[in-house]
């Protein structure tokens, strides 16, 4: 037993609807509604139509909230993207387009939109014939293998997906095709290639952002301080032990004299630079105390004698001067 027919097929009119039939159906539904029974509706109106035909005519054409006319570009993009993702589920696609019915979208897709998009794809394929021959061979091999593995609908959706990408980024073919890029002059190209290694060699930084030269200077300063502290501790132990005779280190004393001479020269340079800065900003009188203090320190340092009464004082003073010189050399770097 099958489903009972909704109407008598022998006495039902088929074919397109006339304007008079549209007016009768629309006026009756506006006044009385459908009543929830589409099978009995044609008899009440006096139409020789099937109840299903009346329902589809009302839902697809005669409803007041239906959009009539052509589709916009935004609607075309929505239909295309949804068709690529879910296929021909027209009712779901129609739910995303207010005022459009599933039947209207299906008819528009089959008659106009699909042909227009596939026609654009063929035209762009002709324009892309200037691409590399190897890329063309690969694309031809893929096109020859695709019908064996994909159905017609899946292949169509794949082609439309490529078309959608071309619509969203029309310059993608230019960016992905190095043949179309402008060529530089050979002299300019060689110049740019020669400059790149120089720039790379000049960047001598640690991967964590630490300067290698600065880190090397810190290592040298730490070594100088460690050596000075070890010498100072040895001299203190010798002074505290009266049984141990002190043996002067002539090489170390000569190094200290050389450091003393270098510090004298550096102090003179610092005082001259400070005096010049004071002249530029008209602050020579206000900064005279600073130059006098530096000059006094220079005289005190240069007049220090190595023939003092205590050998421990000489060694301690030498250690302090060595540490000060190491700090000044570090700051000058």
From Swiss-Prot:
It holds the Pfam family Myb_DNA-binding. One of its GO terms (biological process) is endodermal cell differentiation. InterPro entries: Homeodomain-like_sf, Myb_dom, SANT/Myb. SMART domains: SANT. Residues 38-62, 90-113 bind DNA. The keyword Transcription applies. Residues 122-135 have a biased composition (Polar residues). PROSITE patterns: HTH_MYB (PS51294). It is found in: Nucleus. Disruption phenotype: In myb36-1, myb36-2 and myb36-4, impaired Casparian strips formation replaced by ectopic lignin-like material in the corners of endodermal cells, associated with reduced expression of several endodermis-specific genes and abnormal CASP1 localization in the plasma membrane. Multiple changes to leaf ionome, including elevated concentrations of sodium, magnesium, and zinc and decreased calcium, manganese, and iron. Longer root hairs. Delayed and defective barrier (Casparian strips) formation as well as extra cell divisions in the meristem in roots. One of its GO terms (cellular component) is Casparian strip. This is Transcription factor MYB36. It comes from Arabidopsis thaliana (Mouse-ear cress).
């Amino acid at each position: 037993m099958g489903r009972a027919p909704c109407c008598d097929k022998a006495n039902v009119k088929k074919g397109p609807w006339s304007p008079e039939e549209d007016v009768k159906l629309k006026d009756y539904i506006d006044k009385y509604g459908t009543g929830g029974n589409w099978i009995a509706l044609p008899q009440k109106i006096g139409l020789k139509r099937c109840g299903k035909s009346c329902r589809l005519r009302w839902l697809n054409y005669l409803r007041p909230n239906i959009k009539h006319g052509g589709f916009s570009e935004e609607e075309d993009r929505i239909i295309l993207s949804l068709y690529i993702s879910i296929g021909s589920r027209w009712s779901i696609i129609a739910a995303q387009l207010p005022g459009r019915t599933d039947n209207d979208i299906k008819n528009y897709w089959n008659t106009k939109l699909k042909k227009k998009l596939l026609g654009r794809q063929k035209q762009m394929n002709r324009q892309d014939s200037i691409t590399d021959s190897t890329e063309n061979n690969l694309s031809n091999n893929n096109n020859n293998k695709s019908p064996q593995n994909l159905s017609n609908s899946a292949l169509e959706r794949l082609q439309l997906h490529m078309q959608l990408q071309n619509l969203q980024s029309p310059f993608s073919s230019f960016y992905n095709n190095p043949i179309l890029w402008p060529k530089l002059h050979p002299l300019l190209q060689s110049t740019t290639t020669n400059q790149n290694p120089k720039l790379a060699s000049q960047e001598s930084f640690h991967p964590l952002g630490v300067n290698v030269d600065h880190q090397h200077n810190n290592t040298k300063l730490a070594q100088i301080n460690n050596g000075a502290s070890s010498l100072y501790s040895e001299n203190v132990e010798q002074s505290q032990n009266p049984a141990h005779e002190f043996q002067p280190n002539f090489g170390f004393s000569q190094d200290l004299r050389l450091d003393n001479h270098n510090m004298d020269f550096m102090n003179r340079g610092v005082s001259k630079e400070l005096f010049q800065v004071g002249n530029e900003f008209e602050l020579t009188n206000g900064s005279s105390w600073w130059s006098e203090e530096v000059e006094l320190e220079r005289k005190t340092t240069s007049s220090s004698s190595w023939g003092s009464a205590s050998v421990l004082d000489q060694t301690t003073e030498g250690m302090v001067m060595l540490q000060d010189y190491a700090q000044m050399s570090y700051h000058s770097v």
